[in-house]
């Protein structure tokens, strides 16, 4: 009986820790997103996409499915091979956050804005915007 109770507590702790991770103020959703932007890995980046999101590249804005957005990002990364990405500013509330960053890709610098929303027990990218600095 004691083993059953310990097993139940362990399983509950696993489920609760996943929810707590996203809401924990020390958890930074932008760490993995930044990593995949710097690597130019559209496949891994798209795991963070919402099912439907807005993607804007150089003033061309599209409401896209996750798969469409992945293809758009793959095309961008083919044209502009990333060398580095650095977050320069972050803000938001517990369920909505945004970050501004600088992407060095293809010999150019780009300003990247990322909006994430807490949905279905995890953060998802709702909008990603890539622009040339003005």
Predicted regions and their residues:
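Surface-exposed, charged secondary-structure patches
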Residues: 70-109
